[in-house]
């Protein structure tokens, strides 16, 4: 008798993706983040769906509808904070996932990598629009500042901004369309994630050594299903601790003040996961230059495969490249800190130096160090 799991058209796809998938025998915990991102996406879609049942995307009632969710809806507060902090967990997993890809040379799977970059942009867009919805002070002014950046585009900039706003300022039309996009994008992200996985399964997973592992594969289930379940439990534990003990730790207190176009907050800043990009944006005195640097700070990932000069794929056996990688991590943490600081001395110069170093490491130092390592090994 044939196994329905292996023959039925639907279960066959699931079987070949999550059960009988041949996986490298040596992939470490850094390979857990793909499944964790999937779990984060499911949590966000479910909590978001329940929030959307009670939320109203109208400037007059948006803020009070969020208050109503937290006060009057059964377990509304936990749904709201699971969604808000779930976004933070999502970005932690995203950054670690991208970092893993950089460290172990997973970007050599160019299709998978490029879909991943599109996914990163889509998640960032979704998070930005979601932050506008509670219609607090930081929601309103964050939306105003970030959408206004498009006015730096020559000739069409001003018209483009007014078209996105649906008027002459961030108002009811903007909030309504942001809610619509915020609702639809996670489903587009889900479809893109499926394509991401499709391309990955064309080549098979990379592994820490960067050496092809075709000669040594093990089935995904039970070895990596149990490993992913452990990762998922740790993720849910961290999220639960955050939600139940300090739900506002990563938020901005200004967002508990209803949006007021007549009163600008002293420090306009995005959520923590955008601070590194915000610091790069602010470090360039020219508006268009800042916007280009902001976009390129993420888009630079697309040219990483072209800058791979090493004869080895992974950094596992390349100590000089490892030092540079961790310098890059420290630099990104510095940028994150600077993004949350006011624009004054010494933060301005620190931000500018950190921004220069960020692009220097990725565009110049990494390729040069890789060539030096090749020569040291007489390759």
Swiss-Prot record:
GO terms for molecular function: metal ion binding; ubiquinol-cytochrome-c reductase activity. Keywords: Electron transport, Heme, Iron, Membrane, Metal-binding, Mitochondrion, Mitochondrion inner membrane, Respiratory chain, Transmembrane, Transmembrane helix, Transport, Ubiquinone. The chain crosses the membrane at residues 33-53, 77-98, 113-133, 178-198, 226-246, 288-308, 320-340, 347-367. Its main location: mitochondrion. The keyword Membrane applies. Heme b b566 binds at residues 97, 196. It comes from the Eukaryota. One of its GO terms (cellular component) is respiratory chain complex III. The cytochrome bc1 complex contains 11 subunits: 3 respiratory subunits (MT-CYB, CYC1 and UQCRFS1), 2 core proteins (UQCRC1 and UQCRC2) and 6 low-molecular weight proteins (UQCRH/QCR6, UQCRB/QCR7, UQCRQ/QCR8, UQCR10/QCR9, UQCR11/QCR10 and a cleavage product of UQCRFS1). This cytochrome bc1 complex then forms a dimer. Belongs to the cytochrome b family. This is Cytochrome b. The gene is MT-CYB.
């Amino acid at each position: 008798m044939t196994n329905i799991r292996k023959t039925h058209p639907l279960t066959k796809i699931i079987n070949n993706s999550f059960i009988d998938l041949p996986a490298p025998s040596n992939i470490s915990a850094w390979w857990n983040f793909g499944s964790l991102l999937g779990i984060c996406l499911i949590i966000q879609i479910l909590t978001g769906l329940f929030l959307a049942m009670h939320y109203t995307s109208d400037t007059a009632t948006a803020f009070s509808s969020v208050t109503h969710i937290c006060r009057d809806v059964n377990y509304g507060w936990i749904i709201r904070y699971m969604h808000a902090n779930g976004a933070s967990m999502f970005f932690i997993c995203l950054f670690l996932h991208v970092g893993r890809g950089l460290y172990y040379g997973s970007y050599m799977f160019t299709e998978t990598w490029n879909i991943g970059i599109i996914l990163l942009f889509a998640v960032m867009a979704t998070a930005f629009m979601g932050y506008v919805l509670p219609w607090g002070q930081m929601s309103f002014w964050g939306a105003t500042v970030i959408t206004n950046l498009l006015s730096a585009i020559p000739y069409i900039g001003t018209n483009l901004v007014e078209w996105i706003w649906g008027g002459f300022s961030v108002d009811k039309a903007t909030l309504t369309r942001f809610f619509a996009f915020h609702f639809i994008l996670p489903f587009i992200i889900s479809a893109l994630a499926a394509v991401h996985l499709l391309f990955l399964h064309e080549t098979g997973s990379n592994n820490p050594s960067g050496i092809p592992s075709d000669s040594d594969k093990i089935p995904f289930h039970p070895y990596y299903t149990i490993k992913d379940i452990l990762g998922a439990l740790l993720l849910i534990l961290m999220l639960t601790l955050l939600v139940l003990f300090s739900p506002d730790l990563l938020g901005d207190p200004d967002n508990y003040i209803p949006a007021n176009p007549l009163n600008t907050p002293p420090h306009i800043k995005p959520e923590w996961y955008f601070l590194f990009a915000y610091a790069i944006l602010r470090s360039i005195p020219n508006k268009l230059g800042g916007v280009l640097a902001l976009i390129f700070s993420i888009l630079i990932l697309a040219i990483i495969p072209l800058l791979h000069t090493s004869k080895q794929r992974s950094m596992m056996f390349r100590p000089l490249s490892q030092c540079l990688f961790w310098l890059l991590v420290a630099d990104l943490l510095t940028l994150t800190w600077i993004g949350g600081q006011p624009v004054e001395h010494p933060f301005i110069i620190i931000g500018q130096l950190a921004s220069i170093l960020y692009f220097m490491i990725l565009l110049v130092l990494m390729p040069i160090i890789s060539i030096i390592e090749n020569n040291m090994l007489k390759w």
